[in-house]
């Protein structure tokens, strides 16, 4: 049945619903390969490689050619603008390469977070001015979904009501609506940074508050929820919290409770960001989330960047002779997160120190 909105035809709604459901196919998740040029500078410098366009292309090619098993675990890939238009060594566009593997191409459409006037250290996301034209072109060039990241911080004064309203409106009234009108499934990402001294309970409460503002805005602007996905943080304590560290089960329960209180059942799926957790913690916590009993009407899976790529990048080290070994590492991380997305991960006895290393970056930006 079509929605009450007159902004989309039934055919448009059907296409959006189909794409969203395909992305959250059971046992599959998203590879977030949408790091900006600046973020890639940090990644490549960590292995002693210069941050050139060619090195960025070679690294993304390594990821996207990991082998026939990649599409068993990965349903979609989010790309940065540069990556979206790059090609393999033999001239095949990355978008075509992914489509041939049955993997859905996606695109990061925000242009980063900038300071928000009238707030204490909070930010808003830029990129709305030409978004309609860019979405139309990306759809024409093969994209089927998009991502827009907004950021909240937890402190004694934040998030402010000003930021809550601005970010919700940013995500709902313009970004999501524009994407849907151009045939792109909008992934809504209201990230709450893990920075801070807050306990798990405060992290849960702030997550619930953020979600309530976001979905109020989405509904107010007639966004077709069945054709959207949510990319939230998991509920954790702050990185500087000095109390007892919450268990995986604690994190799972707090996260699911926040979702139950704030995310409509019409939303097909929740694709979690890893938020600077170690690769292994991101997998264990995703598994714990899926093992929580009770009502969970959405698919609960992953949209990981660093938590899928960190060990892979280290193994590659910029050397051609390491490509195959690095791809094996990527496939392994994808496989264990596939298991976690259906609550069947039992731990990784082979996990090395790299997989357990925290990937937290203070005030992280993409």
Swiss-Prot record:
Entry EC number(s): 4.1.2.13
Residues with site note (Necessary for preference for fructose 1,6-bisphosphate over fructose 1-phosphate): 366
Record-linked PROSITE patterns: ALDOLASE_CLASS_I
One GO location term (cellular component): heterochromatin
Tissues where this protein is expressed: Ubiquitous.
Pathway: Carbohydrate degradation; glycolysis; D-glyceraldehyde 3-phosphate and glycerone phosphate from D-glucose: step 4/4
Active-site residues per Swiss-Prot or TrEMBL entry: 189, 231
Keyword annotations of the record: Glycolysis, Lyase, Schiff base
Residues engaged in binding substrate: 56, 147
Catalytic activities: beta-D-fructose 1,6-bisphosphate = D-glyceraldehyde 3-phosphate + dihydroxyacetone phosphate
Protein name: Fructose-bisphosphate aldolase 1
MF annotations from Gene Ontology: fructose-bisphosphate aldolase activity; identical protein binding
Family under the similarity heading: Belongs to the class I fructose-bisphosphate aldolase family.
One Pfam family cited in the UniProt record for this chain: Glycolytic
Role noted for this protein: May be involved in the metabolism of fructose-bisphosphate (beta-D-fructose 1,6-bisphosphate) and of fructose 1-phosphate.
InterPro entries registered for this protein in UniProt: Aldolase_I_AS, Aldolase_TIM, FBA_I
GO biological process: fructose 1,6-bisphosphate metabolic process; glycolytic process
EC top class named in words: lyase
